[in-house]
Amino acid sequence: MKTAQFYIFFFCWKAIWCNGCVLTNITISVEREECEFCISINTTWCSGYCHTRDLVYKEPIRPNIQKACTFREFVYETMSLPGCANQADSLYSYPVATACHCGSCDTDSTDCTVRGLGPSYCSFNERKE
C-alpha cells in the first residue's frame, strides 16, 4: 500500500512541478511594412503551467488573481532585416526572456489575450521584388 501511495504522490508532484513555467525556444515572424516580406527568427519565451484556482464565492476582500506563465526578466536583441538595407530603418528589436515565473499578466508589456494572432503570423505571404 505504501508503494502505491508513493507512486501517486510522485506522479502528482511530477505533473505539478516538472511541467512548470520554464524558458522555451520559439520562432516568431518579423515583418517591416516598408520591406514587404517576413523572416522567421528564433527567440526564447516563457511557457508552461502555473497552479491557479478560481474561487466559487467571490470575496471583495480577497482578489481573485489568475496566475499565468510569464517573464520575470527579459532583454531586447536587435537585428538588421536582410534584403531591407535600402530602407531607412532596417533594424528590428525583439524580446528575449531570461527568467520566467508564475504571476499576473502585465498588459502594459504583454499580449494577455486568450487567442491572439500567434507568433508565426505574417501579413505578407511571400517576398515581393
UniProtKB/Swiss-Prot annotation:
GO terms for biological process: follicle-stimulating hormone signaling pathway; G protein-coupled receptor signaling pathway; positive regulation of bone resorption; positive regulation of gene expression; positive regulation of steroid biosynthetic process; regulation of osteoclast differentiation; regulation of signaling receptor activity; Sertoli cell proliferation. Residues 1-20 form the signal peptide. It holds the Pfam family Cys_knot. Disulfide bonds join C21-C69, C35-C84, C38-C122, C46-C100, C50-C102, C105-C112. PROSITE patterns: GLYCO_HORMONE_BETA_1 (PS00261), GLYCO_HORMONE_BETA_2 (PS00689). One of its GO terms (molecular function) is follicle-stimulating hormone activity. One of its GO terms (cellular component) is cytoplasm. InterPro entries: Cystine-knot_cytokine, Glyco_hormone_CN, Gonadotropin_bsu, Gonadotropin_bsu_CS. It is found in: Secreted. Glycans are attached at N25, N42. Keywords: Disulfide bond, Glycoprotein, Hormone, Secreted, Signal. Heterodimer. The active follitropin is a heterodimer composed of an alpha chain/CGA shared with other hormones and a unique beta chain/FSHB shown here. Together with the alpha chain CGA constitutes follitropin, the follicle-stimulating hormone, and provides its biological specificity to the hormone heterodimer. Binds FSHR, a G protein-coupled receptor, on target cells to activate downstream signaling pathways. Follitropin is involved in follicle development and spermatogenesis in reproductive organs. Belongs to the glycoprotein hormones subunit beta family. This is Follitropin subunit beta. It comes from Monodelphis domestica.
